[in-house]
Amino acid sequence: MRITVLVLLFVGIAACAWGGNMGSAVAVEIISDSGKTLPLYPVSSRLPNRKAYAEAVKGEHYSINVRNRLNRRVGVVIAVDGRNIISGKKSWLRNSERMYILEPYGEGEFKGWRTGMDKINRFYFTNAADSYATAFNDESAMGVIAVAAYAEVCRYEKSEELSSSRNKSSDHAAPSAKAQAEAAGTGFGREEYSPVHIVEFEPESTAVEKIYLKYEWRATLCGKGIIRCGKFRPERNRMWDDEGFTPYPPVWF
């Protein structure tokens, strides 16, 4: 199945020296406009799916950097909060969706929601209630940046070779309205110039890799025990007062 896809005109960028990236076929980084590469906290590394947490900073604009580590072109379907960043539609990370193309060992910087052939509206971290996805009453994948990488079909491969995959779903209790409002999401930010052009690309039927980054506020990550926050304080010995003397009563006359 040959489809029409978008490719960035400028795909070579320099990544920051510190932080974290995720992936083997493609490497994914989240970089804020301050130049900081968000550190990642992996929770799963089973191929073809990889998952990690990332810390979001409210109000900060960010970009998604993807580097192709393969020796052939790959198409990347990118979804933020469950919405395809090119079409804006609900994404299932399928190979029939709108995607960006990376050349062999090439790199792309994706800064926002595509609203035209030469413009995007920036990504920025905000409350879920202010997110682009919530504007469409879609909170099904809030706080998740997902990247599916599809390698280009090689001409020597047999066309009759098929691979099947079955989507599995499970029911979860919906979060409370308060918790959802306080959760992290991605907004529809300022407009910027970002030209692309259209190319033909035939993706393989199955993604070589899928990467899921769950971004949360620092307080949430602390509460979940993903990161250690504050200084470690050993428990005081109830029979050993460091002062060495009997303290005065709370009220002393």
What are the residue ranges of the model-derived segments?
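Sec-dependent N-terminal signal peptides
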Residues: I3-I13
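A detector of low-complexity, intrinsically disordered, Ser/Thr/Gly/Pro/Ala-rich segments
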Residues: M1-R2, G244
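Intrinsically disordered, low-complexity segments enriched in small/polar residues
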Residues: C16-F253
